[in-house]
Amino acid sequence: TGPFPVLVVLHGYVEPGRYRLLAYTTPYADFLAERGYLVLHPNFRGHPPSEGAPAQGLRHVYAVDVLNLLAEVRRGAFPQADPARIALFGHSMGGGVAQIVSLVDPGLKGVVLYGSMSGDERRNLERIRYWSGGSRGQELFALSPEVLRQASAWTYLAELSVPYSVHHGTQDAQVPPEWSWELCHRLKALKKPVECFSYPGGHLFRGEVDRVFRERVLAFLGRVL
């Protein structure tokens, strides 16, 4: 039967050498598929079994891959998909990618951000350097402040037309929750459609916190798709 609304689930950073086909985001993909969504859960390039080299520093090549996937959906590559109803669900790095994609593709119906990276690429690179003990994120010094500004999704928020649903744990030790609160503040100041939720949880939700998160995601998707 169908056609079904489409949800593209974008995973966060996992060291590509350790990445497995069924990523930690798979339970969310399964949960949403069981509730009537056609869920696509791509593995970013360089993350097995996807080919190519993983992105270094800026993740815009992942956004290009997602945009190409969306084009395939709209061309009818998935007969059960409703190409007029597509939303994104991005965790951590995947949330950062989703922000870029949603600015380029205003045809999206909604974006769920879960413990998302920033739309400010300078902050992302600073955090990547911190996580990696300086082994990654050297682009922070190689790219000029102006290039980083132009590469940042937050530079273009005034042009955003896609509704956002933003979720972040107050105990997230990997991605600062303040990044999500700043995004929400900026979007509300611009009168953009956004809802924002904080949770007593970390970078990945568990138990009751996760249950409430899933309910809110379903409610948002039910409204926009």
Residue ranges, per PLM feature:
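Alpha/beta-hydrolase active-site loop
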Residues: G57-A77
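Conserved alpha/beta-hydrolase "acid-adjacent" motif
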Residues: A173-W179
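Short beta-strand/loop motif that positions the catalytic acidic residue
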Residues: L160, V166-H168, D172
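Short substrate-entry loop that stabilizes the transition state in hydrolases
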Residues: G2-F4, V9-E51, D120-E121
